[in-house]
A protein has these predicted regions:
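Generic anion/oxyanion-binding catalytic loop in active/binding sites
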Residues: 1, 45, 59
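N-terminal first-folded block
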Residues: 1-27
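C-terminal structural segments of small proteins and small subunits
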Residues: 10, 48-75
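N-terminal low-complexity, intrinsically disordered patches enriched in charged
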Residues: 18, 37-38, 73
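Helix-centric, low-specificity signal for extended rod-like, repetitive segments
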Residues: 18-19, 32, 60
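A short, structured beta-strand/loop element
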Residues: 23-54
Length: 75
């Protein structure tokens, strides 16, 4: 299993935008993204703070991706 590097909310946002996700709404620091397949996820964007492993696992489940698939997008 591949261990992902520490990523910020902005890093994850840019990767998900490449996959076709769009920001549907934002309340405070929490961003709600959705793609045309109606998959959606919510995560915070705090400047300088990284997303923890538990929240990263939730985001990957929400967008129906494995760590390996996500890691390929980082390269």
């Amino acid at each position: 299993m591949t261990k992902l590097p520490s990523l910020t909310g902005k890093d994850i946002l840019s990767i998900l935008k490449k996959l076709g996700f769009e920001i549907k709404r934002q309340k405070g620091s929490h961003v709600f993204l959705q793609n045309p397949d109606v998959r959606a996820t919510v995560f915070p964007i705090h400047s300088g703070e990284t997303i923890g492993p538990g929240l990263m696992a939730k985001i990957l489940r929400d967008v129906n991706m494995t760590k390996e698939e996500f890691y390929q997008l980082l390269k």
